[in-house]
Amino acid sequence: MILIIAATLWQSLTAVAAVRELYVSPTGNDSNIGSVKEPLLTLKGAVARAVALQEDAAIDGFVVNLAAGTYTQYEALEIDTSLHKPIEFRGSNTAERSTISGAMQAERFTAVEDNLWRVRIPEVVRYGLRFEQIYINGERRFRAQSPNRGEFAGIKQVKHIPIDSTNLGRDIYGWEVLNITPNNPIPFGNECRTQYIGEDAPSSKNKEALGQPLITFFHKWDTTRRPLLHVDSCGVMTIAGRGVYPWNTIDTRSRFFAENDFNFLDAEGEWILSEDGWLYYIPCEGETIENTVCYIPIAQQFIKINGESIEKQVDSITFNNIDFVYASYLTPNEGNVQMQAAAGIGTVVEANFARNIHFADCTIAHTGLGGVWFKRGCSDCSVERCHIYDVGASSVKIGESTIRDNRAEITHHIKVDNNIIQHGGFVFPCAVGVIIFHASDNQVTHNDIADFRYTGVSVGWNWGYGYSPAKRNIIEYNHIHHLGWAQLSDMGGVYTLGMSEGTSVSNNVLHDIYSLYYGGWGLYTDEGSTGIRIENNLVYNCKSGGFHQHYGKDNIVRNNIFAGQIRTQLEASRVEEHLSFEFSNNIIYYSKGVMCGINWANVGHKSDYNCYFCTDSEKKIEFQGISFDEWQKKGQDINSVIADPQFADVAAGNFTPKNKAMLKKIGFKPFDYSKAGVYGSKAWRQKAELSKEQEEAFDKLVDDYEKEMITDW
């Protein structure tokens, strides 16, 4: 018995000795030792303490315990290979969270008028502080803009003037001036503004607002942001910058808004910063000076994890139960060039040459940049049970947009599971929920992805049939919805590119995707998409189609439900000599719009064992003018049927098919689409639900745009 007790005591002591506990508190000090009684103050201090202790052979790793409360952090925590033992940062389990905040709190507003407040930010003049986002009581507020938020200005005429004819490839000029004539003049405060472009730009010539007005253009799938150079008495705006892509230029079908001019300050929730440091704000309904707190983000990033090479990586870092909130983005002097999916825009958490980096039960919110990026040479990392919302760009990014010569540096085996990823792209509307660039063997599963202005999940980064490392990516059991908001075009709930053998897009629920012009698709296999299995998805209420393939080969579209798309149910574009895709065992159900469009009847595909049904008895099932009988005579859908699938309750969103004879005939295997989305506690699942007001706003927007029946492009 004595021996057993002694052995147990020894095991207990050695277990305690293996992991060193450090403690951090908002009332701590980084000169302390990091004990319970003498806690540290910052994460940086905890890392420094761990580095100092790690040579002790009795220590196998560290747990950094963060007391509840708010930790102000204006600079990113940088972790490199100087820390070579595992470390876990563990937040509080109490009702009060452990919060890393990158913001300072402004003083209390004072009233200028009944509906206009102001507060002085002395750091603007004293230290040259700049900011382009603010948060009121934890909610994002937008700089004064014209037209007001949710509205856009049209363009009457655009004149492109190359001033640097250096061809950057594919007819992209090095630099050009654009003269933009809007449909209606924008009410800028001064008739003429001048701003130099470049790193050595002089201070603003605008004597009211700090910084020049910015113009954000929406063109097809991109946005471009440029400072205003000049506006003449007729309202013609002059801007300059790198040439736009000729295949997605700024033209009369583009739209825009202008921001950062005192004349635009006219709507609830708008704000503007004067050059002498006064922040002016129009309060929203219910806000009083006494109950309003203004947060001004200072930090741009929270965490930077950087190994040295694929041979010398940072390893084994975990963040548990910590909130990261309030981070800034500052527009460069020259603005932002167009880039699909805001590809080059960073995140508040970034890792390079790192493995076994894990985020669990964390929050990332209120940012100017995106959320998390496992960028170069990362593997075996994860984001699980995290709430990532109200971000300026994309929420999760995996891999790089370039292919390195050393293929070992390709990021792989990243897991993104059971996260709520919502309300994104507020600074960069072309951003996406989750994007996988040149990266393989990743899992994006059981996430709720909603309220982005563009695509939900993007996979692959090669346009065509050239080499792509984006293989064997798993996009399954996600709930992807309420995307587009009629701001951009050419988007998908799930969007793929390039040779993607082994990739699965399955068991997802995708709905309510609405583009401005063309291309509001549920499932979208774009240029070169190859070897992708698409099955057991429920897709409904998308503008342009439940499925669209631009071009690709050897894709399998099987056992899906495509129900009630708005304009078209199915689309395909490029005719190629090979088999583009197989389309079988699917249910296509609709009441409005047409059955198929663009080039569906001509694209090389094999279609069979499908069920087609239109609830409008006056409409015939046709394939771009080809009757069902004629379609079968062409060798397509020989074993397919026209039959009512007898969904349980379409109005209530219950798409369970009850027509057993039809199911047997086409070989459809019912799947439980209720498993898509987040899982866990009832509270977690409820948190993923959009508010009734948001859903109603989306429905109203769709109704309004459908009344206009915009068909450009």
Show which residues each predicted segment covers:
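Short glycine/acidic-rich loop motifs that flank beta-strands on beta-rich extracellular proteins
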Residues: 75-76, 300, 328-334, 368-374, ...
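Extracellular beta-strand solenoid repeats
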Residues: 65, 78, 88-90, 101, ...
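Extracellular polysaccharide-degrading/modifying enzymes targeting complex plant/algal/animal polysaccharides
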Residues: 19, 23-358, 363, 404-405, ...
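Beta-propeller domains
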Residues: 243-250, 260, 287-312, 325-328, ...
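Bacterial Sec-dependent N-terminal signal peptides
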Residues: 1-19
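Right-handed parallel beta-helix
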Residues: 315-326, 355-366, 378-393, 406-425, ...
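Predominantly extracellular beta-rich ligand-binding scaffolds that present long acidic/polar faces
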Residues: 74-88, 531-652
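N-terminal catalytic cores of secreted or lumenal carbohydrate-active enzymes
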Residues: 341-343, 353, 375-380, 399-400
